[in-house]
Amino acid sequence: MTDSTHRTTAIILAAGLGTRMKSRLPKALHRLGNQPMINHLITTARQVFDDVVVVTGPDMPELEKAVRPFKTVTQVERLGTAHAANTARDLFGTGDVAILYADNPLITAETMRRLLAARREGASLALLGMRPAEPGRYGRIVEDHGRVVKIVEFKDATEDERRITLCNAGVMCAGVDDFRTWLANVGNDNAQGEYYLTDVVEMAAKAGPVVCVEAPEAELAGVNSRSELARAEATLQTRLRNAAMDAGVTLVAPETVFFSTDTVIEADVTIEPNVFFGPGVKVRSGALIRAFSHLEGCEVGENAMIGPYARLRPGTLCAAQTHVGNFVELKNVELGEGAKANHLTYLGDASIGSGTNVGAGTITCNYDGVFKHRTTIGERVFVGSDSILVAPVTVGDDALIAAGSVITSDVPPGDLALGRARQTLKSGQGLQIKQSLKARKEQG
């Protein structure tokens, strides 16, 4: 970061339609780690640059909304990358300016800092390059004694140039005044009639040294198709898994655990295989997340045990020492310390006190077809198996709900509530019915 007279700016080009995505959604809004690609880049750029500006295309209100409160400018006609950058020239700031791409969401802050440092060490222009396993049709970076001479597109490259393994990633950084001048001089004398940023490189080379900062392919490879999006997701998940393990989290089978970028897991948490973390999850120290569980928008307290096959939905808070077992779903639930719901249960829009045990098959009926209603269960309550609590309803501390009950009225503290039909016995009729049914079956 710099003082107000030399503010650095990151210009993110995001006007591309992403036709290879085969989607109505702008390419920059496709998600990685449960947030739009462009938000990854903005978050990283804000760690390095003073200001961030996003260049959008026409008719992209969803994109403009997604990047608020950052400034946007619209490239009315899509006439190439240099044209897009030039659209934002009035927002370049007063110091160095970097051009980034919304479809390069995995560039790290460290790589951005290296780019900016290379520019400040005397380069007229610094750019990012990579050595992909399959260079394919990437533009090649032609160097002479460590200085970049030009970028040549694959289709225009000679056989010798095509053997160059250093490829252009498109990202570059220069001083604001020079950049404005170079952009103004980029022409469109090419088959597509577009203005390309790569043309800036030769201009910069005449003004001073142009240097290439190399970074791994996984950081710089573009996301232009669904398959490339999947590869980027795999790269991101590897980063998130490694970060979790480095922070003291045990992943029994790391490759099967999927995080969101905002997932917070404290040290000494153990996560079993095939667990998915949606947005907004916090897991406190000592918790155990068992296999095949799905968590989103929730918090899990210290030494809690979740799963296997549990689902925690938004608004759920499981306090310390709680147990949420197999095939239990919680939605907008406060589960008090030490409370348990271990089997085959749906609890929605409920508050459950500490020490309460919710038996197998219990359901809170929270929806009347129009409105949601809340169920409040006190501390140390025992809810018998196969109980139905029809909200709104309150069960007081130390109450006991008999198995199979339908509870429609409040239960005072310490009371026993039974809400089921009385059992009736009819001597011998069970055997008679079975024999009758068997006879009918034999008769066809």
Curated annotation (Swiss-Prot):
One of its GO terms (molecular function) is glucosamine-1-phosphate N-acetyltransferase activity. SUPFAM superfamilies: Nucleotide-diphospho-sugar transferases, Trimeric LpxA-like enzymes. It is found in: Cytoplasm. The active site is at H343. Mg(2+) binds at D103, N224. Its EC number is 2.7.7.23, 2.3.1.157. Residues 1-226 are annotated as: Pyrophosphorylase. InterPro entries: Bifunctional_GlmU (IPR005882), GlmU-like (IPR050065), GlmU_C_LbH (IPR038009), Hexapep (IPR001451), Hexapep_transf_CS (IPR018357), MobA-like_NTP_Trfase (IPR025877), Nucleotide-diphossugar_trans (IPR029044), Trimer_LpxA-like_sf (IPR011004). Pfam families: Hexapep_2, NTP_transf_3. GO terms for cellular component: cytoplasm; membrane. Its cofactor is Mg(2+). Binds 1 Mg(2+) ion per subunit. In the N-terminal section; belongs to the N-acetylglucosamine-1-phosphate uridyltransferase family. In the C-terminal section; belongs to the transferase hexapeptide repeat family. HAMAP family: GlmU (MF_01631). Homotrimer. This is Bifunctional protein GlmU. It comes from Gluconobacter oxydans (strain 621H). The lineage of its organism: Bacteria, Pseudomonadati, Pseudomonadota, Alphaproteobacteria, Acetobacterales. The gene is glmU.
